[in-house]
């Protein structure tokens, strides 16, 4: 089989082609339908979280174990040599990678995963670096979109909330730009999509519109991607002002498309009310579950040649 992802670092979604994204999605679907509990037997995966995480870490470690691999690492760097003794990231990566077959990491500094890949002896998978990239979240988002829409092409997609600091929306916008989707960006001016993303869309000839409210947007959509205003990136006064700017309620779904699905990278705060959970449009909990299959697919492709083009 031809597998272009074998032994490859996964640092940014922009490092992946349309064909590679489609391969990951199809592999996730295959593993969801047909589990492979021994695929990573005797493989050791380092799971190193220099920044706190719940869903990403647990999802990734579940993915490893359900493929038969084992996990080493830490959920918080505060008690490691890097946190306690001032060891450099480069030194930590060189040592930890020597114990493992792949290195999965999250870090609060932009570019940390790229730096780690320069010193690692095994493939590095980025679990999020600051407000920059979160490629494995994007892969589970793509899988969830494909699962609900039957395609990734020519969809109407809205991103709502914190579009400035939300690394999930940056990565997913870049990925979907390869599939001729039309974008609707809904955010307060202080949290609008970064100019570099806007410039990339213009260069690719993608269609997009920017809004400061949800009014008139919902009826157009196939996918509504909600995000929280991230408290850790604001002082308390700014956060209280921003957090409730855009709230989705069940009453707002009148006149929407039957195939509309609401996604959210979680955790949610105020931006989706709980009455949305019981509507046919809510898909964020299934989306979170899909993180296991998307990360299984990535591990399967990076560490084995069992999948790919025949």
From Swiss-Prot:
Iron found in the keyword field: no
Keyword terms: Pyrimidine biosynthesis, Transferase
Gene Ontology MF terms: amino acid binding; aspartate carbamoyltransferase activity
UniProt catalytic activity: carbamoyl phosphate + L-aspartate = N-carbamoyl-L-aspartate + phosphate + H(+)
Coiled-coil region list: none
Domain of life: Bacteria
Gene3D superfamilies assigned to the protein according to its UniProt record, in alphabetical order: Aspartate/ornithine carbamoyltransferase (3.40.50.1370)
Main enzyme class: transferase
Disulfide bonds: none
Keyword Transmembrane attached: no
Any Gene Ontology CC annotation: cytosol
One Gene Ontology term from the biological process aspect of the record: amino acid metabolic process
Binding site for L-aspartate: 85, 167, 228
Pfam families for the chain: OTCace, OTCace_N
EC identifiers of the protein: 2.1.3.2
Binding site for carbamoyl phosphate: 55-56, 106, 134, 137, 266-267
InterPro entries: Asp/Orn_carbamoyltranf_P-bd (IPR006132), Asp/Orn_carbamoylTrfase (IPR006130), Asp/Orn_carbamoylTrfase_sf (IPR036901), Asp_carbamoyltransf (IPR002082), Asp_carbamoyltransf_Asp/Orn-bd (IPR006131)
Pathway of action: Pyrimidine metabolism; UMP biosynthesis via de novo pathway; (S)-dihydroorotate from bicarbonate: step 2/3
Function per UniProt: Catalyzes the condensation of carbamoyl phosphate and aspartate to form carbamoyl aspartate and inorganic phosphate, the committed step in the de novo pyrimidine nucleotide biosynthesis pathway.
Subunit structure: Heterododecamer (2C3:3R2) of six catalytic PyrB chains organized as two trimers (C3), and six regulatory PyrI chains organized as three dimers (R2).
NCBIfam families (UniProt xref): asp_carb_tr, PRK00856.1
Similarity section: Belongs to the aspartate/ornithine carbamoyltransferase superfamily. ATCase family.
Annotated protein name in UniProt: Aspartate carbamoyltransferase catalytic subunit 1
Naturally occurring in which organism (per UniProt): Shewanella halifaxensis (strain HAW-EB4)
Underlying gene: pyrB1
């Amino acid at each position: 089989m031809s597998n272009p992802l074998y032994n490859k670092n996964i640092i940014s979604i922009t490092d992946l082609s349309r064909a590679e994204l489609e391969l990951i999605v199809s592999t996730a679907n295959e593993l969801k339908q047909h589990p492979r509990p021994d695929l990573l037997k005797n493989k050791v995966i380092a799971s190193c979280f220099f920044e706190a995480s719940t869903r990403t870490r647990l999802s990734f470690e579940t993915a490893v174990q359900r493929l038969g691999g084992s996990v080493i690492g830490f959920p918080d760097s505060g008690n490691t040599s890097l946190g306690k003794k001032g060891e450099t990231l480069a030194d930590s990566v060189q040592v930890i990678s020597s114990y493992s077959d792949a290195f999965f990491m999250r870090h609060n500094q932009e570019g940390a995963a790229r730096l780690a890949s320069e010193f690692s002896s095994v493939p590095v998978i980025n679990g999020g670096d600051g407000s920059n990239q979160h490629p494995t979240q994007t892969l589970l988002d793509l899988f969830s979109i494909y699962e609900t829409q039957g395609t990734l092409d020519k969809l109407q997609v809205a991103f709502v909330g914190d579009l400035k600091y939300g690394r999930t929306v940056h990565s997913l916008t870049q990925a979907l730009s390869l599939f001729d989707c039309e974008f609707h960006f809904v955010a307060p001016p202080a949290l609008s999509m970064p100019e570099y993303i806007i410039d990339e869309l213009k260069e690719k000839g993608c269609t997009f519109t920017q809004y400061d409210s949800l009014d008139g947007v919902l009826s157009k959509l196939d996918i509504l991607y909600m995000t929280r205003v991230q408290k850790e990136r604001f002082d308390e006064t700014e956060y209280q002002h921003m957090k409730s700017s855009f709230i989705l309620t069940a009453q707002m779904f009148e006149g929407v498309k039957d195939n509309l699905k609401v996604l959210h990278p979680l955790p949610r705060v105020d931006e989706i009310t709980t009455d949305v959970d019981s509507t046919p449009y809510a898909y964020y909990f299934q989306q979170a579950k899909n993180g296991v299959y998307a990360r299984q697919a990535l591990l399967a492709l990076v560490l084995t040649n069992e999948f790919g083009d025949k």
